[in-house]
Amino acid sequence: WRVCFISVRHSDRGLVSELSKEFYELGFEIVATRGTAEIIKQNNIPVKVVKKVAQGRPHVVDMIKNGEIDLVINTSEGRQSIIDSSSIRRTALEEKVYCTTTIEGGKAVCSVIRNKDYWTVEKLQTLHDRLNI
């Protein structure tokens, strides 16, 4: 994971600074649409601006298809935003790029990445044996 694309609806803009700061501190480069990027920049977090789909190429969908985006956080409202978001989310799914549609989902991803060393992977059979199932 190295590049996080963030584009949020107006009602989520008050929460985006904290979220982008967390991802930046985890080593992510932040890429955002113009409106979201302006909020992020106000908090001294480096951010690269990318075009929305309706603004012409190259845009965020091109970046996802080219393997330039590793994580998508995309909340939307309004007709054009929902249209743009559907192509972003569909492309993320097709390209196997993790996509969350809520700020809370983004916070959960941060938490998992931050605490990844505390997680272990076990076979289901091992858990069954331990629990006597």
Region annotations inferred by a language model:
Residues W1-T100, G106-V109, Y118-I133:
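ATP-dependent carboxylate/acyl-activation modules
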Residues I113:
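Histidine/acidic-residue-rich catalytic or RNA/ligand-binding cores of hydrolases
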